[in-house]
């Protein structure tokens, strides 16, 4: 049986901890919170959790429910600025720290999310919606 990174880091409980910690920070963040149109962050949290589960080799529930991730397209209506990407990384770092991965696992995860955060920047303006 092939072991995936998802399995190596502890599967769903680990992703759940990372994402819950991340969204606890987002909920209080004055830069990021306005980017989420829903009153309740729960649906966004669930989508992100399912995306990360699938990305790292777990069940493909995300694609089964939502199709191809198309991350830039899904985020296009929102002004993702360099400042927003930085704040996003601050909260994701808190999530990774809470998960207490091995240094190698942490580096692999962090490398992906830092690249993803930079990739999602779509404007230099400080507007929350485009």
Report the location of each language-model feature:
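Heme-based O2/NO sensor domains and their adjacent alpha-helical segments
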Residues: 1-3, 16-97, 103, 109-112, ...
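Short, low-complexity N-terminal intrinsically disordered segments enriched in polar/charged residues
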Residues: 1, 5-11
